[in-house]
């Protein structure tokens, strides 16, 4: 109650069930650990609530497929709070690629690493909390790749270094789709890396730093060597962009749904 009073929160619930069944609630934002998403999402859908859920949306495709079907049956929208799909810079870069100035996308390279102290009880390294590099940070890289590839990858090679708990502490991925576009990903929870994404094309390349919440990118053209800096949006407004897209998706704009 003290927290609610401090931040002027008008309604407080004594249980999750009380919130899920409240007829005045239209949308629920789920921000709990990964391993709880499926259960909470299912409960929300059955109570006719639209859902925005933090990444990773579920632990596997079977869970997600079931929930998508259930959402369609109950006429509700589910969306993943994956910043890559909602930050304005990505739509702007997509327009540049669609213009043809850079030519075909050939290769995408991704890095994301943070140094987490070995604490086997926290969510990063705890199997019971769906820990590991892929579910925590790898989903950003894969979403970036999917945004810029012409089709989803259908070939995958991977190498994993496990943490003492068995979750993936480090991972390397090599992906390719039917168009021959390739992508490489290096992830780590125990080694700091820059959050860098690069899209290499026939006539130049795009480089994006801090790509999970990017607001700026550089576009370099091979023939002239010129580099153009592109800006759009603000880092601190990332959640607002997600909410705006969620509202538009509920209103019927399917282009704002990225599942």
Give the residues covered by each predicted segment.
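Beta-loop-alpha module in the N-terminal Rossmann-like domain of NAD(P)-dependent dehydrogenases
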Residues: 7-70
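Hydrophobic residues in well-ordered beta-strands that form the structural core
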Residues: 13, 53-54, 78-80, 208
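Contiguous beta-strand/loop segments that form the cofactor/metal-binding neighborhood of enzyme cores
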Residues: 143-216, 243-254
């Amino acid at each position: 109650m003290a927290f609610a009073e401090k931040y002027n929160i008008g309604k407080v619930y004594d249980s999750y069930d009380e919130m899920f069944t409240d007829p005045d609630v239209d949308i629920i934002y789920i921000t709990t650990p990964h391993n709880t998403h499926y259960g909470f999402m299912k409960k929300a859908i059955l109570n006719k609530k639209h859902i925005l859920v933090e990444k990773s949306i579920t632990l596997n495709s079977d869970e997600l497929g079931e929930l998508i079907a259930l959402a369609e049956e109950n006429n509700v929208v589910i969306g993943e709070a994956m910043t890559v799909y909602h930050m304005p810079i990505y739509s702007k870069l997509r327009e540049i690629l669609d213009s043809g100035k850079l030519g075909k996308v050939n290769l995408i390279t991704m890095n994301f690493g943070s140094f987490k102290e070995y604490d086997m009880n926290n969510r990063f390294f705890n199997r019971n909390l769906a820990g590991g590099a892929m579910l925590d940070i790898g989903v950003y890289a894969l979403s970036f790749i999917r945004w810029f590839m012409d089709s989803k990858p259908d070939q995958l090679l991977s190498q994993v270094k496990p943490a003492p708990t068995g979750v993936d502490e480090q991972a390397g991925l090599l992906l390719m789709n039917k168009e021959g576009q390739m992508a490489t990903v290096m992830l780590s929870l125990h080694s700091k890396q820059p959050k860098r994404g690069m899209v290499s094309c026939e006539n130049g390349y795009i480089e994006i730093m801090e790509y999970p919440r990017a607001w700026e990118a550089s576009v370099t053209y091979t023939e002239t060597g010129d580099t153009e800096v592109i800006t759009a949006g603000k880092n601190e407004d990332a959640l607002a962009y997600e909410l705006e897209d969620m509202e538009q998706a509920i209103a019927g704009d399917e282009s704002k749904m990225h599942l």
